[in-house]
Amino acid sequence: MASQGTKRSYEQMETGGERQNANDIRASVGRMVGGIGRFYIQMCTELKLSDNEGRLIQNSITIERMVLSAFDERRNKYLEEHPSTGRDPKKTGGPIYRRRDGKWVRELVLYDKEELRRIWRQANNGEDATAGLTHLMIWHSNLNDATYQRTRALVRTGMDPRMCSLMQGSTLPRRSGAAGAAVKGVGTMVMELIRMIKRGVNDRNFWRGENGRRTRIAYERMCNILKGKFQTAAQRAMMDQVRESRNPGNAEIEDLIFLARSALILRGAVAHKSCLPACVYGLAVASGYDFEREGYSLVGIDPFRLLQNSQVFSLIRPNENPAHKSQLVWMACHSAAFEDLRVSSFIRGTRVLPRGQLSTRGVQIASNENMETMNSSTLELRSKYWAIRTRSGGNTNQQRASAGQVSVQPTFSVQRNLPFERATIMAAFTGNPEGRTSDMRTEIIRMMENSRPEDVSFQGRGVFELSDEKATNPIVPSFDMSNEGSYFFGDNAEEYDN
């Protein structure tokens, strides 16, 4: 890991702040989520939502999406320049669900974007509070990560669907800033770069002229973000090659796919943060909790504590299992879609099932679904223990990259082995390691061959009782070492479609 001296913590990225001490960070993150909470309360008033309607996660998501849309400057500009019939570029909206005569009914609301921006700024001391908006984007991204597989997107860019554990944050909008870049997986960055290179190959003018210069700067910035996620010198050296290429093309795409595969064993450092739906912060603010005064962290006990005593509802379709819906949202709240199920189960205190065994579809309800048959139920988002979120990828204490089963990107800093199917992964590396990156490729393959599935990652790190807020007594869980726990493995989850 590069010396922490050069890195900002992700709370600092989250709040756009420069170096601050721990208390300042806790206060500014607290200010951010408090602002989200105040905004949510105000929106519930504006929309005349009852308490129960305000606790409905579908309503929370609609309100979050509306404010994100109101602040999406590029899209707003585009909509105003390309007016489409029957759509007002100055308005945004979505489904709001209300309880009428013992049934849930859907009502489509339209809201003025300018008005939404005013309410948001008012809740955030008159500021734009971009950090809060990014926070909502990351929550939506984590929800997508837990709900959908990206097999199609992977195949389209020439990657292998088994690399799905590298795809964290693949649905984050480009405008999500440093905090967004921190939570993107290696596969997500590789995919963005491949798309860019392909455009350059197909469009002669992509790298040319004034626009091309900006494109080039963006390309190199993305390369540096990806380089920063790798933890071995050889992987980083290969990224330098990709970044410095005069005219990126197929050779670079090959190198990037090679690097993505290598990240299945030599894992990248990807940040994880617990981002909760706006209604959860709203409930806490409404009950008189002062986030800024108390301080808040996205990677410590605070989100667990908040979820211990917030009651959130969800609409449930006729053949869905409410417990499974709860698991989906729990995983999204803790950014645990790519965590080992053994670890998640231990922390949650109930067995966490792989995606393919869940009887639940996504959280959002399509506009053509029948509301007559919709029920609602309380989401069970509590946990038995809490653990610190990691940004490391879990490399072993031998200071060389550790083994990782084909689809795990650790979320929690908890001791475990990362079992993996070496044969499966290494099979992807047949072929000729030649060309200008051959020595680096050889070195990377050697490191991968030397990693052992039984090596222990996060040595000595454990989970904590919910009463242990200072993290003084780590409980190091023991797992069945042979049994790996990948969430998407051998699975039939729906695809994510924009």
Curated annotation (Swiss-Prot):
Keywords: Capsid protein, Helical capsid protein, Host nucleus, Host-virus interaction, Ribonucleoprotein, RNA-binding, Viral nucleoprotein, Viral penetration into host nucleus, Virion, Virus entry into host cell. A motif (Unconventional nuclear localization signal) lies at residues 1-18. Residues 1-23 are annotated as: Disordered. A motif (Bipartite nuclear localization signal) lies at residues 198-216. Transmembrane segments: none annotated. SUPFAM superfamilies: flu NP-like. InterPro entries: Flu_NP. It is found in: Virion; Host nucleus. Late in virus-infected cells, may be cleaved from a 56-kDa protein to a 53-kDa protein by a cellular caspase. This cleavage might be a marker for the onset of apoptosis in infected cells or have a specific function in virus host interaction. It comes from the Viruses. The keyword Ribonucleoprotein applies. The keyword RNA-binding applies. GO terms for molecular function: RNA binding; structural molecule activity. GO terms for cellular component: helical viral capsid; host cell; host cell nucleus; ribonucleoprotein complex; viral nucleocapsid. GO terms for biological process: symbiont entry into host cell; viral penetration into host nucleus. Belongs to the influenza viruses nucleoprotein family. Homomultimerizes to form the nucleocapsid. May bind host exportin-1/XPO1. Binds to viral genomic RNA. Protein-RNA contacts are mediated by a combination of electrostatic interactions between positively charged residues and the phosphate backbone and planar interactions between aromatic side chains and bases. Encapsidates the negative strand viral RNA, protecting it from nucleases. The encapsidated genomic RNA is termed the ribonucleoprotein (RNP) and serves as template for transcription and replication. The RNP needs to be localized in the host nucleus to start an infectious cycle, but is too large to diffuse through the nuclear pore complex. NP comprises at least 2 nuclear localization signals that are responsible for the active RNP import into the nucleus through cellular importin alpha/beta pathway. This is Nucleoprotein. It comes from Influenza A virus (strain A/Gull/Minnesota/945/1980 H13N6).
